[in-house]
Curated annotation (Swiss-Prot):
Family listed: Belongs to the GrpE family.
PANTHER family: GRPE PROTEIN (PTHR21237), GRPE PROTEIN HOMOLOG, MITOCHONDRIAL (PTHR21237:SF23)
Subcellular localization(s) per the UniProt record: Cytoplasm
NCBIfam families, per database record: PRK14143.1
Lineage: Bacteria, Bacillati, Cyanobacteriota, Cyanophyceae, Synechococcales
Disordered, as annotated region: 1-39, 207-239
Organism per entry: Prochlorococcus marinus subsp. pastoris (strain CCMP1986 / NIES-2087 / MED4)
Primary localization: cytoplasm
Subunit composition and interactions: Homodimer.
Function recorded in the entry: Participates actively in the response to hyperosmotic and heat shock by preventing the aggregation of stress-denatured proteins, in association with DnaK and GrpE. It is the nucleotide exchange factor for DnaK and may function as a thermosensor. Unfolded proteins bind initially to DnaJ; upon interaction with the DnaJ-bound protein, DnaK hydrolyzes its bound ATP, resulting in the formation of a stable complex. GrpE releases ADP from DnaK; ATP binding to DnaK triggers the release of the substrate protein, thus completing the reaction cycle.
GO cellular component: cytoplasm
Protein's UniProt name: Protein GrpE
GO terms (BP aspect): protein folding
Length: 239
């Protein structure tokens, strides 16, 4: 009986010892697992931090590249816009110049007709009623033609007593003058015209050589020049 109880005691001690060992092993395993878990968490945090750092670095590099590309495209846009604006202005200027050239050509062809009307008005002195009626008729046409020229921007030059300017005038004759200083226009032989501020036709003029100067042209040459002009008188400024 005593032996049996002794065995039971030993078995109980063994069970207790096993249970204690089991608990100790379990505690060790739990501690190890906790440490491993903490280690894994630290590693994960380090990996995440490294990845985040790399991502930020890559994004910064990409942002810098995009900013450079943006500046390049912006410069190209500004240059293209400026080129287009210059092209548009050049086209507009060329069109205006072409228009002026075409209008100038047409108007220049009309001016001799205007000169003939003016010459007829000054030279012809109709006496009969029929001749006066005819004279008034073509002078009415002349005034209409003058009005059309004005509407197109044509304006006559005023040259007498003005300083000779080769950009505006063509000196056909030169002679001494007690009234006008040298290079002052004495007489207008053919009217000059402006078109929108530009010279449409140069004025043919007689220019003073100043007092006491000798005429550089012989009378025959002077007569020839006046004959070449065909004794044309300029258009008057009145309607």
């Amino acid at each position: 009986m005593i032996e049996k109880q002794s065995d039971n005691v030993e078995n109980l001690e063994d069970n207790v010892s096993q249970e204690v060992n089991k608990n100790e092993d379990s505690s060790v395993i739990e501690n190890q697992t906790s440490e491993d878990k903490q280690t894994l968490e630290v590693d994960d945090e380090n990996i995440y931090a490294e990845d985040l750092k790399n991502t930020i670095t890559n994004n910064d590099a990409r942002l810098e590249q995009l900013e450079k590309e943006h500046e390049t495209l912006k410069s190209q846009y500004v240059r293209i816009a400026a080129d287009f604006d210059n092209f548009r202005k050049r086209q507009s200027r060329d069109q205006d110049d072409l228009k002026v050239q075409l209008v100038s050509k047409a108007l220049t062809a009309i001016l001799p007709i205007v000169d003939n009307f003016e010459r007829a008005r000054q030279q012809l002195k109709p006496e009969s009623e029929e001749a006066q009626t005819l004279h008034r008729s073509y002078q009415g046409l002349y005034k209409q033609l003058v009005e059309v020229l004005k509407q197109q921007g044509v304006s006559p030059m005023r040259v007498v007593a003005q300083q000779f300017d080769p950009k505006l005038h063509e000196a056909v004759l030169r002679e001494p003058s007690q009234e006008f200083n040298e290079d002052i226009i004495i007489e207008e032989l053919q009217r000059g015209y402006h078109l929108e501020g530009k010279v449409l036709r140069h004025a043919l003029v007689k220019v003073s050589m100043g007092p006491g100067q000798q005429n550089s042209q012989e009378p025959e040459e002077k007569d020839k020049v006046e004959e070449d002009i065909d004794s044309e008188n300029p258009i008057s400024e009145e309607n």
